[in-house]
């Protein structure tokens, strides 16, 4: 326990929390060619690679991912949610934060139904999360 005098001389230091999605906290001013500290909820980027990776133990699957170069120049790995996708190299995508627990190094999700990413086909429930339009009533 510190004494009152010690606290007066050197107060409590609050902990600094690191961001879980640091690429969203950086901007880029292309006119001045400098990085800025402007946070954004989503960012646009171009796919440089699309592929599959295997999850950590004890899970087993082929999870779809894309390597994305963002508008701020940072390259990140983003997960492609849902069944099936239409992404390929040079597709323009929108990413949001949110890690995938069983894929190491994947801290971002691609937003389905935005920009070049199509929504999931034939999805009836939870459509808004997968960019699927409401089916026509028959």
UniProtKB/Swiss-Prot annotation:
Alphabetical GO biological process terms: translation
Keyword Nucleotidyltransferase among UniProt keywords: no
Family annotation (InterPro entries): NA-bd_OB-fold, Ribosomal_uS12, Ribosomal_uS12_bac
GO CC, one annotated term: small ribosomal subunit
Residue ranges of the region described as Disordered: 33-55
Positions bearing 3-methylthioaspartic acid: 102
Gene3D superfamilies: Nucleic acid-binding proteins
GO MF terms held by the record: rRNA binding; structural constituent of ribosome; tRNA binding
PROSITE patterns: RIBOSOMAL_S12
UniProt family annotation: Belongs to the universal ribosomal protein uS12 family.
Protein name: Small ribosomal subunit protein uS12
Source organism of the structure: Bacillus velezensis (strain DSM 23117 / BGSC 10A6 / LMG 26770 / FZB42) (Bacillus amyloliquefaciens subsp. plantarum)
Gene assigned in the entry: rpsL
């Amino acid at each position: 326990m510190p004494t009152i005098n010690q606290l007066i001389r050197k107060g409590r230091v609050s902990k600094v929390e690191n961001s879980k999605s640091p690429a969203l906290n950086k901007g880029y001013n292309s006119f001045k060619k400098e990085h800025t500290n402007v946070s954004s909820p989503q960012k646009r980027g171009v796919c440089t690679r699309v592929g599959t990776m295997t999850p950590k133990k004890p899970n087993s699957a082929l999870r779809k991912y894309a390597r994305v170069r963002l508008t701020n120049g940072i390259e990140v790995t983003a997960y492609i949610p849902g069944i099936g996708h239409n992404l390929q190299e040079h597709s323009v995508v929108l990413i949001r934060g949110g890690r995938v627990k069983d894929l190491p190094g994947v801290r971002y999700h691609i937003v389905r139904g935005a920009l070049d990413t199509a929504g999931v086909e034939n999805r009836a429930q939870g459509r808004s999360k997968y960019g699927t339009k409401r089916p026509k009533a028959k």
